[in-house]
């Protein structure tokens, strides 16, 4: 059983992992190079706790299971599970995994929070790569239950299954990707939506607010309970997906999308930055994060009542 977790890097994603693991009574050792980041991390833990408490029915925050260190060796040498959260950079991750592999226990699982890099390459210089994989979460990690588990070419199924059990023990819903591919699953879908949005803005058809509303008030409401395929299955009526493909399949030949990304010019960047600034209406990122977190807590609590009827 995995009891002690090491989180390497305390940025947005690393902080989320620390909070989720502490919430589920795991001993957590957080690593970062600057000791000053410890204070920042604790401040964020305390900000988030009211939302975590409400979602997971926890009484009070216990920091006795939390330790902050500035040595990778100290962070990983006694850990059962290591969750790496360094920037999306092959050279940096390869170097880091080499160090982690040297100091980690032989059977300690090493998972990268990478959102699109290939695990085989990330762990190319890591000792015992059979216990390595991707464990890609969604932001905010402390609330969102999804995590994509992506194996490398040398990953052993024993460790994949062990990682799956661990993520379930901290109230996550593991998505097992059959083999490695750039961007994994969710980010490839999000990237397609993002690129299409950039084209629409670049060509002057809509603002960032218009596009966000098109998702928020349309498919986004459904997607929190049912994904694209089940949603389209329902669109086919009584005959389901069979009729849907027959009815709407020809639309695949229509020029409805441009998946190749447009050039990110200064003009396009300005439109996007200006648009999102206007959408924020003067609210800080922290303030908007609080609103989002409160919404997600209530949404997830409500979803539990219905998802069991679909996913039995």
What are these language model-derived features?
Residues 1-55:
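NAD(P)+-binding Rossmann beta1-loop-alpha1 motif at the extreme N-terminus of oxidoreductases
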Residues 2, 24, 172, 176-178, ...:
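NAD(P)-dependent Rossmann-like dehydrogenase/reductase catalytic/cofactor-binding core
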Residues 16, 141-150, 170, 175, ...:
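Active-site-proximal catalytic alpha-helix in oxidoreductases
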Residues 28, 82, 110-111, 132:
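Hydrophobic/aromatic residues located in beta-strands of well-ordered beta-sheets
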Residues 33, 51-109, 117:
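Rossmann-like NAD(P)-binding element
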Residues 112-179, 183, 187:
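Rossmann-fold dinucleotide-binding core
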């Amino acid at each position: 059983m995995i009891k002690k977790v090491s989180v390497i890097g305390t940025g947005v994603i690393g902080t989320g992992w620390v909070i989720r693991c502490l919430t589920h009574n795991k001993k957590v050792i957080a690593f970062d190079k600057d000791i000053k980041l410890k204070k920042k991390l604790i401040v964020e833990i305390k900000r988030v706790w009211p939302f975590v408490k409400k979602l997971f029915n926890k009484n009070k925050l216990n920091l006795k299971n939390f330790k902050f260190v500035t040595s990778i060796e100290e962070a990983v040498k006694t850990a059962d599970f290591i969750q790496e959260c360094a920037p999306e950079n092959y050279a940096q991750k390869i170097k880091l995994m080499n160090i982690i592999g040297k100091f980690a226990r032989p059977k300690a699982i090493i998972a990268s929070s990478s959102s699109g890099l290939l695990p085989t390459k990330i762990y190319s210089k890591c000792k015992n790569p059979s216990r390595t994989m991707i464990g890609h979460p969604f932001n905010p990690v402390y609330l969102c239950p999804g995590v994509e588990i992506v194996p490398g070419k040398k990953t052993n199924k024993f460790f994949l299954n062990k990682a799956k059990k661990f993520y379930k023990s901290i109230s996550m819903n593991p998505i097992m990707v059959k083999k490695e591919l750039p961007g994994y699953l969710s980010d490839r879908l999000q990237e397609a939506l993002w690129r299409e949005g950039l084209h629409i803005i670049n060509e002057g058809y809509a603002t960032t607010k218009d596009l966000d509303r098109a998702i928020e008030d349309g498919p986004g409401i459904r997607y929190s309970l049912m994904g694209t395929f089940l949603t389209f299955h329902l669109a086919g009526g009584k005959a389901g997906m069979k009729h849907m493909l027959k009815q709407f399949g020809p639309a695949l030949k229509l020029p409805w999308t441009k998946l190749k990304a447009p050039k990110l010019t200064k003009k396009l960047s300005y439109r996007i930055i200006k648009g999102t600034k206007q959408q924020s209406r003067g609210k800080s990122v922290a303030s908007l994060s609080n609103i989002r977190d409160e919404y997600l807590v209530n949404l997830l609590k409500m979803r539990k009542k219905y998802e069991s009827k679909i996913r039995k």
